[in-house]
């Protein structure tokens, strides 16, 4: 990894940790930032890590000590893919890439109307569309409206129904995107609207996130560049704790 890419990866990791902290707060959970990692001492919401490293070569023992590993399901986002947590009974769930896109308009114009959810009913409609019947719509709570750096982006059809979306989280240097979806066409259909919204809302900030597999290829087609690897480690095996949706 080049020095520039490492700086970009660190900015993306910090932004992602700030989003994980916001999601935890929306569920009434306390967490804390320290020099090497963000961590929550109690189990975080489903699909969200209990810790995110902020620098390369974080101290493993101190990191594991900050989270609850008394039961299966604890997870760590190893932001630089440089830790070995096997001795603490963790296994790699999946690997991914941090992605970065300079601040600029999308190459493809959006075909939906996009806005920021600003009331509980819209957050609920967004959550139901994001979940698409998989049983986790309560993950996204109206308390997210109290987070000044978090923006739930809703793409609406001509009849006003939420059919696409993403979450944007602003930090000092970047704006992070996660949970991108479209009921028809998947992330490929959602990215133009999301990037157009970011260009309007934060015209000077680059966009970051992380993806893997087919979703990484889609992000690259929309102007992103991979800037560094990461790993998700899972304590024991508990398939409903984490998925690969890019949180």
Residue locations for each model-derived region?
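Terminal substrate-recognition subdomain of acyl/acetyltransferases
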Residues: 1-28, 38-43, 102-107, 169-171, ...
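N-terminal charged segments
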Residues: 1-70, 130-149, 246-247
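Short glycine-aromatic motifs
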Residues: 29-31, 89-90, 150, 224
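A short, internal acetyl-CoA/4′-phosphopantetheine-binding micro-motif in the GNAT/acyltransferase core
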Residues: 52-58, 180-187
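Acyl-donor-binding surface of acyltransferase catalytic domains
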Residues: 54-120, 195-199, 204-217, 221-239
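A short, well-structured alpha-helix characteristic of acyl/acetyltransferase catalytic modules
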Residues: 119-129, 245
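A conserved beta-strand-loop-helix scaffold within acyl/acetyltransferase catalytic domains
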Residues: 135-183, 228
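Conserved acetyl-CoA pyrophosphate-binding loop and the N-cap/start of the following alpha-helix
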Residues: 185-197
